[in-house]
Amino acid sequence: ADECMSLQPQHKYVDYGFVDTLVYVQDMDTVLRMYAGTKDYKTVSNSSMTNVERAENTATDKIAVLYAEGQIYDSGSEGIVEDKVLKQIKTIHKDDAVKAVVLRVNSPGGSADASEQIWHAVKTLQEKGLPVVVSMGDYAASGGYYISCCADYIFAEPTTLTGSIGIFGTVPNISKLREKVGLDIDGVTTNKHAALQTNAIYKGMNPQEYALMQSMVERGYDLFTNRCAEGRGVSQQEIKKIGEGRVWLGKDALNIGLVDELGNINQAIAKAAELAGLGQYAIVDYPEKTDPFEELLKMFDTTTPEERLVMKMREFASQPRIMALTPEVTIQ
């Protein structure tokens, strides 16, 4: 209880019997099917019954272009959101007409855990035999490089900001302010580290707590550099020489082996087609690109507050976590 399990390596959860095994989010379906003793399953909820997608034409070979733009988040609605990206990758994985994938990255980084989950999901595409080519935009740094590093081929613009292979943690400390205003903090906990995060903010960290936090950061950096080394086919030590948060222009990243070629997204698509041995192919965007003019017209589709409220409620109800809570409907 006094080892502050929230900051320990994940394997200790198994060692102490808190969990049975460790799996990636992307692999949960496989685990559930194994325990359920079925090869496939399908759930039906009220919202999914009214949200029927049209069958796609799978006669033409496709190249999927997956756009990963913005900050990387564990959850939310804007930027590169873990569950949204994993869902898009799963859709690509299931489409047998997709023969190659271009990952368009325009991100300064973000959540280390979400980056690891997306990295693993990209690997599952490669395990299926799909070539993955990365096209970097203005920046693909930190987590942006993390999700890119396992690609079969990486393009960057000459002025792309990339690299930033590093990880850090910050904990605010307002202990002096608390003392100045005469505020005291107390509570009852089950072990000495149960309120570590709260105490760190209001009271500061003692040497043991600081060591726990530092250990967590160092494990994250070790994993990050290992992923990069594996993806680029070099030693971890070589990655660490150009790591520690250093940021590189695309043209310099080419010289040190972080990318394979300078070029734009069109060249990345052409390279993906080459690696997949494709002649003619269709390009499919994920998420689907919308026409800005059509989006503007949609704003005028409803005129009353009631109608706009209904639209927002439908949008809210269609979220996966909300759908999971809706009652199951049995069709007889």
List each language-model region with its residue ranges.
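C-terminal long alpha-helix characteristic of the crotonase
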Residues: 19-62, 225-231, 260-301
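Intrinsic disorder and flexible/low-complexity segments
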Residues: 60-63, 67-97, 216, 287-332
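Cleft-lining beta-strand/loop regions that shape enzyme active-site pockets
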Residues: 55-180
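Active-site proximal loops enriched in glycine and acidic residues that flank catalytic Cys/His/Asp
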Residues: 67-70, 105-107, 136-138, 158-160, ...
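Short glycine/threonine-rich loop-to-helix capping motif typified by GTGT followed
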Residues: 112-117, 252-255, 297-299
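C-terminal recognition in membrane/secretory proteostasis and scaffolding
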Residues: 104, 180, 274, 282-287, ...
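Charged, glycine-interspersed solvent-exposed loop segments at helix/strand-loop junctions
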Residues: 1-31, 175, 179-256, 260-262, ...
